[in-house]
């Protein structure tokens, strides 16, 4: 009897760009030796839309509706970073009420983003039930967004010097009710998932990143904090009104997929704490800076006849960006979202460089999956949390 023939050559497998676990149009060229991953090459660019070049041919106000298409699951953060840049260039003060409203919207958006990470992540490793649970809570957040901004997604709510509109009557009470309800749901998630032996088998010790390694790769957000580095831009940069609230940076030291899950689950609870404090302490006053018209420093009576009335409460659509360089950043759900802006005394930016957290965090994927099993690719990729809209831009 002859022995069965064996093959020693490697197999190359294409995963994506339509694979349901790719979280968008990501393509992985995976080299396999049986079930063992030898190499993995991510192929990007299927969702490239030229967002940086579009920004260089638009005024800031014209460009605002575009930015919600970067990370379309956390649109408040892309809006925040877009208005923060000209606010710093023009030294524009944001009223306290507007700053509190911004914090509330940002943290609600963080919770919604983490929820839509949790559901697909659990589905990737075989747990379908949480995928349906998270839409129950996410729907309530989108109802709050719709009541305040008029849109469930792509809100276009942030403005230079404030926000587009004040909170509607009764919105604060509804948001407080949601916070109380959501805390019970997070407890339910933890009971259902955290100590589940099958879940722990899939994530514990999988995709380990050390603290120094995370820094060297430029990782940020939960990817960095799960490796033992307590770095959160809300604490570091003191932007908006985060210093006025009592909350803590959530972190773990193990650096594996389980640690990244625990960081995000804890961050949702901390976000609720911030929202509750902001809702209870929100002050009266304007929701936008009524002095933004000072962008134009040149006194021109003829220009003033028409346009002073036109921009009495809004920034001019054609204000000039001063000739300087500026880097601004916020702590988005996926990590550090930044913009490098170069003004050239024109109405369009000379350079608008986007620093998306998902693009940077994705670079470590080939190193994490080498010498792992094929099934672990889904676990590791899901724990990174990427959205191809911001990766490809």
UniProtKB/Swiss-Prot annotation:
InterPro entries per the UniProt record, alphabetical: NADH_Q_OxRdtase_suD, NADH_UbQ_OxRdtase_49kDa_CS, NDH1_su_D/H, NiFe-Hase_large
GO molecular function terms attached to this record: NAD binding; oxidoreductase activity, acting on NAD(P)H, quinone or similar compound as acceptor; quinone binding
One annotated Gene Ontology cellular component of this protein: chloroplast thylakoid membrane
Main location (coarse class): plastid
Keyword Acetylation: no
Lineage: Eukaryota, Viridiplantae, Streptophyta, Embryophyta, Tracheophyta
Reaction catalysis annotation: a plastoquinone + NADH + (n+1) H(+)(in) = a plastoquinol + NAD(+) + n H(+)(out); a plastoquinone + NADPH + (n+1) H(+)(in) = a plastoquinol + NADP(+) + n H(+)(out)
Database matches in PANTHER family: NADH DEHYDROGENASE [UBIQUINONE] IRON-SULFUR PROTEIN 2, MITOCHONDRIAL (PTHR11993:SF10), NADH-UBIQUINONE OXIDOREDUCTASE 49 KDA SUBUNIT (PTHR11993)
Presence of the UniProt keyword Translocase in the record: yes
Protein name: NAD(P)H-quinone oxidoreductase subunit H, chloroplastic
Domain of life: Eukaryota
Keywords: Chloroplast, Membrane, NAD, NADP, Plastid, Plastoquinone, Quinone, Thylakoid, Translocase, Transport
The species this protein was found in: Daucus carota (Wild carrot)
Family classification: Belongs to the complex I 49 kDa subunit family.
Gene Ontology terms describing biological process: photosynthesis, light reaction
Protein location: Plastid, Chloroplast thylakoid membrane
Membrane topology according to the record: Peripheral membrane protein
EC number, as in UniProt: 7.1.1.-
Subunit structure: NDH is composed of at least 16 different subunits, 5 of which are encoded in the nucleus.
Biological function: NDH shuttles electrons from NAD(P)H:plastoquinone, via FMN and iron-sulfur (Fe-S) centers, to quinones in the photosynthetic chain and possibly in a chloroplast respiratory chain. The immediate electron acceptor for the enzyme in this species is believed to be plastoquinone. Couples the redox reaction to proton translocation, and thus conserves the redox energy in a proton gradient.
